[in-house]
């Protein structure tokens, strides 16, 4: 993991060096410029490689090596998106970043700190510089962090717990029935939201009522609006989303909703790595801290 981290750091430095050192008209570099570009990448990557902090995190059996790899990869991916942003299908890079973000949740939350940098790269690629725009980009990055940290991560087990209580305590169903129903409903809602938005894109790109309803339902079941595990905040945010989307349905492109729905879906898939914790706990291993063998104990794990 640490070796690959250095590789992606090298590629990142080379990317920025190429922006500073102009190539010839045919895209080639003179020997001196090539040494400057690739040499700067090698020097920067190797300097980080042999630094005390990185070296000793690389040789110990901890989560930081994999976390560093996720950090290096997602930032390199946003640079790849920046290169191909005007091409058709460039959103695939953003979706891959979201998937790796979801996977990184199961490793270490440190990787989420790349979100502000990623949002700024997106902003400077799509818009001209202005201080107002930069502040807005920072605001969007904070909102994305809040959605993941205080929405999706605690929201999924919280909503699963509500379903579990309903099906077990009220309806008298077997244990874990509510969890199974919730997972099926969430997956169905996400697929519906993606399909509806894609269907509209194929027609004229204008939002329709089924598109908005499916999107808001998918976001709700994914835990996005339930900030701090609060049902009241969740309901208010759901109503706000519905009002804004219906009022701005002629302005907001369906492609945005399609991309957001796919990104939330892959984040949930990556977040699913936590299923290993529940499976391991149900095996009654000798080391089983907090015994997270159900959705209620998993929430506080």
Which residue ranges define each predicted feature?
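Membrane-interface transmembrane helices that cradle and orient dolichyl/undecaprenyl
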Residues: 17, 29-35, 74-94, 101, ...
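Transmembrane-embedded, aromatic-rich helix segments that form part
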Residues: 110-122, 154-158, 231-238
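Transmembrane alpha-helical segments of multi-pass membrane glycosylation machinery
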Residues: 1-10, 33-40, 44-52, 68-72
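Aromatic-rich transmembrane-lumenal/periplasmic boundary elements in polytopic membrane proteins
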Residues: 258-301
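Membrane-interface alpha helices of multi-pass inner-membrane proteins
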Residues: 44-46, 93-107, 217-226
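Membrane-interfacial entry segments at the cytosolic side of transmembrane helices
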Residues: 128-139, 171-181, 202-212, 230-233, ...
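Short acidic/glycine- and proline-prone juxtamembrane loop motifs at membrane-interface regions
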Residues: 53-64, 110
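Transmembrane-helix motifs of polytopic, lipid-linked glycan transferases
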Residues: 1-28, 73-77
């Amino acid at each position: 993991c640490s070796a690959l981290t250095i590789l992606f750091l090298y590629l990142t430095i080379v990317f920025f060096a190429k922006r500073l050192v102009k190539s010839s008209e045919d895209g080639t570099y003179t020997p001196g410029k090539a040494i400057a570009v690739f040499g700067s990448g090698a020097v920067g990557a190797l300097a980080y490689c042999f630094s005390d902090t990185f070296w000793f995190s690389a040789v110990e059996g901890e989560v930081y090596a994999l976390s560093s790899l996720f950090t290096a990869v997602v930032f390199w991916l946003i640079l790849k998106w920046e290169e191909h942003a005007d091409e058709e299908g460039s959103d695939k890079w953003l979706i891959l970043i979201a998937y790796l973000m979801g996977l990184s949740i199961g490793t270490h939350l440190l990787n989420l700190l790349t979100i502000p940098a990623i949002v700024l790269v997106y902003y400077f690629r799509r818009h001209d510089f202005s201080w107002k725009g930069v502040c807005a980009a920072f605001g969007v990055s904070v909102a994305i962090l809040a959605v993941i940290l205080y929405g999706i991560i605690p929201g999924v087990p919280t909503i699963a717990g509500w379903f579990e209580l309903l099906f077990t305590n009220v309806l008298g169903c077997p244990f874990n029935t509510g969890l199974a129903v919730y997972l099926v409903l969430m997956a169905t809602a996400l697929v519906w939201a993606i399909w509806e938005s894609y269907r509209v894109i194929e027609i004229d790109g204008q939002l329709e009522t089924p598109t908005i309803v499916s999107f808001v339902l998918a976001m709700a079941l994914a835990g996005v609006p339930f900030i701090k595990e609060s049902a009241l905040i969740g309901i208010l945010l759901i109503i706000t989303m519905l009002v804004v989307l219906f009022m701005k349905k002629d302005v907001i492109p369906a492609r945005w909703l399609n991309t957001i729905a796919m990104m939330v879906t892959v984040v949930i898939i990556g977040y699913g790595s936590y299923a290993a914790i529940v499976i391991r706990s149900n095996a009654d291993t000798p080391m089983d801290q907090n015994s997270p063998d159900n959705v209620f104990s998993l929430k506080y794990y």
